[in-house]
């Protein structure tokens, strides 16, 4: 399938003034810009959330099981099913970050890796991208290293169980549901 990118700079907005109003690196910054549209109109306050890029991984074991996580998400106030995910650290490529996060959160490593999507959570007001990978034939190595704020349970689910989670709207994070839907829409990308 040929990649197509219609996100061009054909009609860029001009930044007239910019002020950082919240700065909490590396997690979040909030910027307030004064911008001018191509037709000359000026928007005096346009807010942008600045985040580092994110990654997530559809990881499938040699036995064809999906490596999933369940964890409480404070923002939603509920426990959610998710695919392994995290933040890219400075100097990492998306794949390096994805491999690191998969191992840190689940203890799974190896396999064959393919980047299957690069998405924006909200291109209107967020500056980062989320890089989604498919990792096939991953194996456990037992080296889990959770961050201080992580409290998760690793679950191995069948293809049908993951598909049912999607159909029943049980995967709440859109940047995790989207690559899973893509995986299933493309027939499992020919894998497992």
Residue ranges and their predicted role:
Residues 1-25:
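Extreme N-terminal tail/first-helix region
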Residues 7-8, 13-14, 34-40, 138:
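Short, positively charged
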